Amino acid sequence: MPPNCHIPALGCPIDRSHPEIEMQVTMPNLKPEGNSMPDLPVLDLPLIEGTPASLAGYGEVVSDPKRQKIEIVRWPAQGWRPVDANSGDEGGTTEGIFACQWVGDVLKAQNHAVGGDYVLGWSCLPSQASEGNSTLGRHRALMWRANYHPDGGQMFFPLEPAPFVVPLALPGDDVTPQDFKAFWFDGSKGLYLHPNVWHDGVFPATDTGRYFGRQGRVHARVSANFPNEFGCYLGAPLPRESAF
């Protein structure tokens, strides 16, 4: 952790004078072992029902995945000459199953659209996590990182009707843990995220979750690491029943 970072503040920015921390941000290990993670405070996120109104600015509720448009961002010009109007956004989309599974206290995921393999979080402090029986009753997921895609949007649509939660924050590189909210869905509809919206993956309230995914094929990823940058984890509630 950077020097002079006071953990209780939950808001200490990264000190980029430390090259080892810079490496963790630019080249993250997306499958960290729990025993390699520090014991830190947890910032519990507010839980909000995912509706068209609450998702304004973040994305959209998806009723029909076949008809959902995926935004593709045109490649940015490097100088005063513009990118030709019929170019720079022709990479298209890629699709596949986003599969999540709780293995004891550890939430693992694979994004078959882009070949991603992740540890999304833990149901307790990662140093205490077991891949056998759950250490504690699973009532929340501790999230350790987030990212956004500047090249395009992303869709998740449940293949089985079960509740899930997606933590989100609005675009901006100066994001803080306090900017995040946890959006709850009952599993009857899906979620589309605009480009540049901070997210990680899907956090199922049940043992497993499978979601049809579609996103920009370029798959640029800009990341934030909460333990390294802010000295905390984000706690996403995982209720199985609606509280709204």
Regions found by a protein language model. Name each.
Residues 154-157, 190-191, 202:
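His/acidic/aromatic-lined binding-pocket segments of jelly-roll/cupin-type domains
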Residues 232-234:
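Compact, glycine/acidic-enriched structural inserts
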Residues 3-5:
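Ser/Thr/Pro/Gly-rich low-complexity, intrinsically disordered segments
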Residues 9-182, 215-224, 236-244:
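Non-catalytic, conserved peripheral segments adjacent to functional cores
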Residues 197-227:
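A short beta-strand-loop micro-motif that forms or neighbors metal/cofactor-
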Residues 184-198:
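Conserved metal-binding segment of the jelly-roll/cupin
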